[in-house]
């Protein structure tokens, strides 16, 4: 079937979804029985789906999540220590709309990073801006940015996202400068965006990570006292792999 001029106009207007649906309708004789409004509605619905799909791809690419995790893959039976009622509330994403924070703690292999990425993926699907960083590398990036004039711009980019994931907090003590960098991030986002922090350390030991006690007080005051908390223990949180091979089991030796 030769291309229809309307198809070409839709493409020129950037209405790719409508153009695809239009061509599909031309090849389906049964569509002729539909009213004009019904056919137009199908075209508009297809365009909306197409745009939502593109936005999700863009959101996920920008988020740069460490793991390809989704909340649907959570194995609640293996999730020992997980507050399932709280996680169900977190999965709705309402807490992000209220600009609240989340702290996830537990030993290596309990699925901290996986859970954080799963919630980040859900936020992307909810059309929210998300950004993932490992704390050690982010602090290195801020140190480099301070030297080449990008420091303020990098801080602004961290402040703008609706959900910032800070993974692997507290692997090593922070210098005074690193503590100040972290305070800048937390202060910029306080009451303006949501932050997920994952750590192997219990929250009660976080103060010890920051060398300067004054900065430690300021960081924890903004981040800890009103945040939701998930304390994990036990085995990995991923579902076992399906026969189709769609799901990859999370290795408890590498899960964080």
Predicted regions located by residue number:
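Short hinge/gating elements
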Residues: 8, 24-28, 72-73, 101-105, ...
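Short, residue-level hotspots on alpha-helical faces of the histone-fold
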Residues: 42, 46, 118-122, 188, ...
